[in-house]
Amino acid sequence: MAIATAYCGHRAARASVLLTGLVMVVGMSLLSAPAWAEEKVTISAAFSPDKLGAPALVKGGAEFSSTTSRVPSPISKITIIGPAGLSLDLKGSATCSQAILEEKGPEGCPARSVAGSGGGMGIFELAGQIIEEAFTVEVFVGNNKPGHYEVLLYVNAVSPVSVQLVFHAVIVQFPKPYGLGFSFDVPEVKTLPEASNASVKNAHLTLGATPAEQKHFHVKGIIVPKKCPKGGFPDEAIFGFEDGSTVAAKSTIPCPKSSKKH
């Protein structure tokens, strides 16, 4: 696992928004100009197990803060881009739908449709007071047809503000040295009257089929590339923020120690 930090800002004279970004990566670089406010993001990612050509879980985490504000700017869009050779095998999986999640919640989805889980800590400001709120994330297969893969993310928070959101993301192929990735917009999350919109302080996410799911449902899920390029697996994630700033994260996941670099 590797960890790195990045900063990004936006021009005061023009609030143009470059929206794209999220969690599966390590290390960062930034795309920005002289800034009015700066967002700081620290991200980590790893494969588990770390074995070439094998089904694995992808585990990622992120910490958010601002250099000029007590609360980081709310996230407006998230994109995750994996390395070339990363593949998905959803044979044996089931699917869920946005309508079911909105009506019944995760309990309405088939067990075979589960594709990951996570959570984190939300944060907002009210009358000078910083308020934190835990949230959970559950990920489901929305479409398991090859070439048309989709995932659904269900975010749930209970107190002090009740929030239930469903995000829809289409999985697409990015140019080399990258591979599969997905992106989704994040709407404004209102909190309490006179309070700021909800931001994220930290988040963690695990994607893929667990060993139990692989055994009982025969779903491989995410498969690590068969070859690791010299220097490791290149990954990228970009976070678009409500204040117009963008943090672009480019990094590598180290090759398995026992693998031969290509």
Enumerate the language-model features and the residues they cover.
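N-terminal secretory signal peptides that target proteins for export/translocation
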Residues: 1-14
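Bacterial N-terminal signal peptides
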Residues: 16-29
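Ser/Thr/Pro/Gly-rich, low-complexity intrinsically disordered stalk/linker tracts of secreted
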Residues: 24-27, 35-262
